[in-house]
Amino acid sequence: MTHNFLNHAPGFSYQNQAPQPQYYTRQPPSAGAHYPPNPLTPSQYVGGPSYSAGRPYQSQHAYAQPGCTSCGTGCNTGCNVQANCNIPNFYTDFKPPSFQTTYCPPSVNVGCYNTPQKTYPQTNNYRSAHNPNQFNMGFNTQVPSFNYGGGPCVTYGTPSYSQQQEPQHYYKKHKHHSHHRPKHVKSSRSCKSCN
């Protein structure tokens, strides 16, 4: 599996930290809380102390989608991203020797969120749905790519979730992102209940 290191967000170098103000990860879930962006500290970027020491994942990868009241079982059935899901985030979770890993056990793959899992050309970076300043890394066409602003909780390398449909309410409310929307495949499973 090959990666493209030449076309990243402005100012990003694989050897250096990403620019401080622009990139976000998730806060731990709490009852009644909606998705809140959580600015990263410099130590959380690739190359920072947390990366070198092995950053813990437990508090970073469960969050409520807009329209849901909380994470896990608190969201509408079939549309939530449950707790303890390690959704890969390039700036914090990228580990070149072992990147092709299972980030979410299949038992947690229960919902869809914004953009479905999809493959993209190797040089295709596109903006996160929630944070237009956060970019995804483009993978080669053999490897699923994710929207780190809120992709489905998936098992990395499993194509089944490419059949999920993104919530239709999302782009109705965010027309300015419509040109970033990748083509998605309609299926019988949608996120209408999260409207």
Curated annotation (Swiss-Prot):
Residues 13-28 have a biased composition (Polar residues). Residues 170-189 have a biased composition (Basic residues). Residues 1-51, 160-195 are annotated as: Disordered. This is Uncharacterized protein R346. It comes from Acanthamoeba polyphaga mimivirus.
